[in-house]
Amino acid sequence: MSTRIAFLKGHGTENDFVIVPDPENALDLPPAAVAALCDRRAGLGGDGLLHVVRSAAHPEARGMAAEAEWFMDYRNGDGSVAEMCGNGVRVFARYLQHAGHVTEGDLAVATRGGVKTVHIAKNGDVTVGMGRALLPAGDVEVSVGEREWPARNVNMGNPHAVAFVADLDHAGDLYAPPSHAPAGAYPDGVNVEFVVDRGPRHVAMRVHERGSGETRSCGTGACAVAVATARRDGLDPAATGTPATYTVDVPGGTLVITERPDGEIEMTGPAVIVAEGEFDSAWLEGVLA
Ligand SMILES: N[C@@H](CCC[C@H](N)C(=O)O)C(=O)O
């Protein structure tokens, strides 16, 4: 028997998500189902999917239930699992507010990258405490076609390679993932950011996301870019005791990132619920058959 399954559509700087509320974790969402839902022609369409589950109801989040009532079970558009999604967690918080589960102010959200603190401001922007960046040692390089660039390896819970380029167009059409070297640098794949300067503490980026392709924004990517740019500029808040704030333009908008002297990184930007509706479980079963 077919049932109606609720979904919403939301975005943060045009990094867009299918949102599936499922508080008791009753839905089966294998990778193929996620990919079908995120398909832009035959499905609902999104860079990724936010499965909204109570932490106590999800085996990966039970240990965080005392700290955070809700778990962001994030999936990339191809159905793969990622540790963290910075825009996703801001849109996730906006959904919780929209659904009446929380009001503006602070809330904790469980993710595979740990518990994140999110602040829903009165002016509408959503800020997330992203934790600290790790900067693994060792040179990495990314390439697209004939062009190659040295890149900074930054881990924001998920892996990134940040390359400073002369022109964002040099990254090409980004239909295929950029190559990277050495081959073993990212055993689980990598998100690749291309960065140009726009002004003092102001950069612009494009991104090719692991599991989603080129997207119009990536929150963890923007944080990786802010940290890589700060180090390139000779700024290390932990050493100087002074926070470093960068404005990061992405194709879908602007994010503001601050790295504090304790290493904690905060990211602020818009998070929007666009629509809500229902799909028929029979459609999904048909796609998966
Ligand atoms: N768009 C996200 C990142 C999503 C996960 C990424 N594709 C990965 O596989 O690590 C963001 O806003 O951070």
From Swiss-Prot:
Active-site annotation: 85 (proton donor), 218 (proton acceptor)
Subcellular location: Cytoplasm
EC code: 5.1.1.7
Main localization, broad class: cytoplasm
Reactions it catalyzes: (2S,6S)-2,6-diaminopimelate = meso-2,6-diaminopimelate
Entry-linked InterPro entries: DAP_epimerase_AS (IPR018510), DAP_epimerase_DapF (IPR001653)
Record Gene3D superfamilies: Diaminopimelate Epimerase, Chain A, domain 1
One term under GO cellular component: cytosol
Keywords: Amino-acid biosynthesis, Cytoplasm, Isomerase, Lysine biosynthesis
Annotated site residue numbers, Could be important to modulate the pK values of the two catalytic cysteine residues: 160, 209
Superkingdom field: Bacteria
Single annotated GO MF: diaminopimelate epimerase activity
Single GO BP term: lysine biosynthetic process via diaminopimelate
Biological pathway: Amino-acid biosynthesis; L-lysine biosynthesis via DAP pathway; DL-2,6-diaminopimelate from LL-2,6-diaminopimelate: step 1/1
PANTHER family associated with the record: DIAMINOPIMELATE EPIMERASE, DIAMINOPIMELATE EPIMERASE, CHLOROPLASTIC
Assembly and oligomerization: Homodimer.
Cited function: Catalyzes the stereoinversion of LL-2,6-diaminopimelate (L,L-DAP) to meso-diaminopimelate (meso-DAP), a precursor of L-lysine and an essential component of the bacterial peptidoglycan.
Protein family (similarity comment): Belongs to the diaminopimelate epimerase family.
Protein name: Diaminopimelate epimerase
Organism listed in the record: Streptomyces coelicolor (strain ATCC BAA-471 / A3(2) / M145)
Gene coding for it: dapF
